[in-house]
């Protein structure tokens, strides 16, 4: 391990820079720097040499040319193990630069600002920074590259422990991270530029939703024992910029390692439960809700959700959108086996009770509003990309197409079952009353079959459908679904409409004295 004697620090994100530079100075490292970083360090009393003084060439072109100089890149790229390189560097007065600390202009923050112009974006495309990062990363055997200020403490500790040197393993890992950093940065620029509208040269072009070249960066969270099935290999990756409140922000408090299917089901449960404003419980099995309820507290919500389908709830994922107490966890553990229990927070008593089931995975996930910008689905040789289905409706958005108007209670129940239907695999039919699902029919090729399944689920659970409401995620292609619903004593239906036979469906509702509201919005889920 060679000792670091000279470092170059040039940062846009300067968090922790002063402390890190102070640690380097204590180890006798000479520090080169530029612009705002140099001023920050000098003001903090850290001895620093301006790059312009080091190279003998001033910054120019409004700061566009600062580090693009042979004394900088030669010092970074030169191989210390090649006599030819060493001789050339000595001939031209180029000294070694052993450590490079660089992060890049804030391009993402710039283009996120309202009114960002093309000129604004272009001026925040870093040139010298990526050049130094790539140079240092390429020459990792001799140069360490730090692009993430969060790494400063660990690097400082290793330098102190090794008398100013870093291991080959550390330098190589930093190199890999650096190349990922520049790849993500260039991908972000490409996404922005290729999503601009045709009036790109107008100064303030419109940004389209889908770039012509689509680049995404992901960070591996874990390798998994296997994938959806034991013969499949798998890993879990986190979006480099995840949406607020997304599952990837989970903190696992206890239990076995999450499996591929655990994560897929937990995501379905979390997206569903956080869509409710009132305290809610969602129980998911094979990515489908099998019981959902809203109530005044988590215990009541769980009891109602569980009552929908006690058989399917076995081995399920249970999610809440409120802090969970000990009484709720005790009720769950007394009732059933579960794979995952998740909520924004758990009381100390709740965790103590859950600890008795040591294999149960307990997750805390921040409850924040937010959705991924895109949903992605791989197909053979391609990728389907769409915006997320985050549409929410209220009573004012609905149109009543039946002779009978819904009652106040029916209005509330219609909105509830409609929200649940959005998270059920198509074809989806949901029956419910009083903030509780009574029957869920999911994933059938025929809508009337999903309707019959929902009715059978309610019957098996001993739940009386008289006066309940029904939701369909898409229109009824024929009146048969409405007829089956009417046979159950259900008195109100919500669905998108849009079928060629809509009038036939509306007439069927009137024949049965059913109140029918249409949304104009479909919620297919595949």
UniProtKB/Swiss-Prot annotation:
It comes from Neisseria gonorrhoeae (strain NCCP11945). This is Bifunctional purine biosynthesis protein PurH. It comes from the Bacteria. The keyword Oxidoreductase does not apply. Pfam families: AICARFT_IMPCHas, MGS. Residues 1-147 form the MGS-like domain. InterPro entries: AICAR_Tfase_dup_dom_sf (IPR024051), Cytidine_deaminase-like (IPR016193), MGS-like_dom (IPR011607), MGS-like_dom_sf (IPR036914), PurH-like (IPR002695). HAMAP family: PurH. The keyword Transferase applies. Keywords: Hydrolase, Multifunctional enzyme, Purine biosynthesis, Transferase. Its EC number is 2.1.2.3, 3.5.4.10.
């Amino acid at each position: 391990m060679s000792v670091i004697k000279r470092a170059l620090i040039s940062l846009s994100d300067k968090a922790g820079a002063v402390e890190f530079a102070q640690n380097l100075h204590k180890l006798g490292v000479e520090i080169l720097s530029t612009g705002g970083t140099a001023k920050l360090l000098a003001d903090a009393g850290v001895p620093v040499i301006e790059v312009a003084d080091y190279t003998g060439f001033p910054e120019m072109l409004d700061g566009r040319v600062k580090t693009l100089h042979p004394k900088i890149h030669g010092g970074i790229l030169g191989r210390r193990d090649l006599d030819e390189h060493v001789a050339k560097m000595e001939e031209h007065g180029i000294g070694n630069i052993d450590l490079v600390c660089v992060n890049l202009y804030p391009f993402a923050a710039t283009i996120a600002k309202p009114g960002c112009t093309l000129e604004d974006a272009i001026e925040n495309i870093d040139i010298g920074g990526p050049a130094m990062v790539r140079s240092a990363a390429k020459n990792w055997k001799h140069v360490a590259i730090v692009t993430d200020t969060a790494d400063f403490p660990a690097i400082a500790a290793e330098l102190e422990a090794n008398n100013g040197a870093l291991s080959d393993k550390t330098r190589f890992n930093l190199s890999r991270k650096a190349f990922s950093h520049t790849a993500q940065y260039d991908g972000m620029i490409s996404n922005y530029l290729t999503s601009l509208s045709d009036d790109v040269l107008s100064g303030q072009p419109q940004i389209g939703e889908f770039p012509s070249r689509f680049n995404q960066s992901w960070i591996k969270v874990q390798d998994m024992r296997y994938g959806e099935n034991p013969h499949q290999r798998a890993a879990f990756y986190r979006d480099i910029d995840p949406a607020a409140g997304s599952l990837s922000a989970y903190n696992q408090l206890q239990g076995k390692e999450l499996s591929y299917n655990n994560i897929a089901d937990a995501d379905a449960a979390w997206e569903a439960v956080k869509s409710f404003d009132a305290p809610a419980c969602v129980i998911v099995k094979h990515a489908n809700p099998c019981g959902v309820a809203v109530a005044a507290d988590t215990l009541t919500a769980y009891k109602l959700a569980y009552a929908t389908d006690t058989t399917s709830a076995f081995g399920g994922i249970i999610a809440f959108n409120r802090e969970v107490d000990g009484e709720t966890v005790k009720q769950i553990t007394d009732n059933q086996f579960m794979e995952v229990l998740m909520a924004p927070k758990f009381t100390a008593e709740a965790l103590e009770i859950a600890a008795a089931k040591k294999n149960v995975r307990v997750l805390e996930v921040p409850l924040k509003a937010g959705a991924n910008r895109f949903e992605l689905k791989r197909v053979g040789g391609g990728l389907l990309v769409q915006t997320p289905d985050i549409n929410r409706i209220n009573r004012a958005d609905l149109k009543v197409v039946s002779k009978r108007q819904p009652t106040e209670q029916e209005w509330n129940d219609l909105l509830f079952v409609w929200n649940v239907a959005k998270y059920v695999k198509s074809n989806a039919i949901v029956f419910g009353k009083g903030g509780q699902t009574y029957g869920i029919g999911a994933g059938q090729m025929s809508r009337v079959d999903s309707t019959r399944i929902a009715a059978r689920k309610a019957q098996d659970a001993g739940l009386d459908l008289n006066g309940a409401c029904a939701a369909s995620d898409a229109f009824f292609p024929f009146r048969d679904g409405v007829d089956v619903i009417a046979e159950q004593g259900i008195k109100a239906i919500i669905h998108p409409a849009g079928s060629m036979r809509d009038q036939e469906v509306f007439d069927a509702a009137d024949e049965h004295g059913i109140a029918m509201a249409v949304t104009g919005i479909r919620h297919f889920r595949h």
